[in-house]
């Protein structure tokens, strides 16, 4: 699949009694794949597993950013679900160079800014701002 506009792509799945959403920064050139590992194993030596892959075919140096959000709940006795929709509104790379990477995550009424210093890990940090 593709997100021709770029920005953020989301994939929500259900596991156990919870919902999980992968919020991934993508570009218009990004290729998104749902995979089934072990599907072509004629001897059935591999455990069948599913996977999600983001590929940047033309990139030589690329930063991948994915935020995994746990949300919602399925009540097996009542057969009802609540909070199915993720609260993450946006994930974006503000800046990215050899020195540091800055990412913003809009979540509900808050914006989380994450800074990763590639040269000095002690300068890596985060800040939460209310809109």
Summary of predicted features, one role per range:
Residues 1-131:
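CBM-like, beta-strand-rich accessory domains located in the C-terminal region of large
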């Amino acid at each position: 699949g593709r997100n021709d506009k770029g920005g953020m792509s989301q994939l929500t799945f259900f596991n156990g009694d919870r919902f999980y959403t992968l919020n991934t920064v993508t570009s218009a050139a990004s290729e998104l794949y749902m995979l089934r590992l072990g599907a072509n194993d004629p001897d059935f030596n591999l455990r069948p597993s599913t996977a999600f892959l983001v590929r940047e075919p033309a990139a030589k140096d690329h930063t991948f950013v994915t935020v995994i959000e746990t949300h919602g709940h399925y009540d097996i006795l009542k057969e009802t679900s609540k909070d199915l929709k993720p609260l993450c509104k946006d994930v974006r790379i503000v800046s990215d160079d050899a020195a540091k990477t800055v990412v913003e995550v809009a979540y509900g009424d808050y914006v989380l800014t994450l800074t990763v210093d590639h040269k000095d890990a002690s300068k890596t940090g985060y800040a939460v701002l209310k809109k």
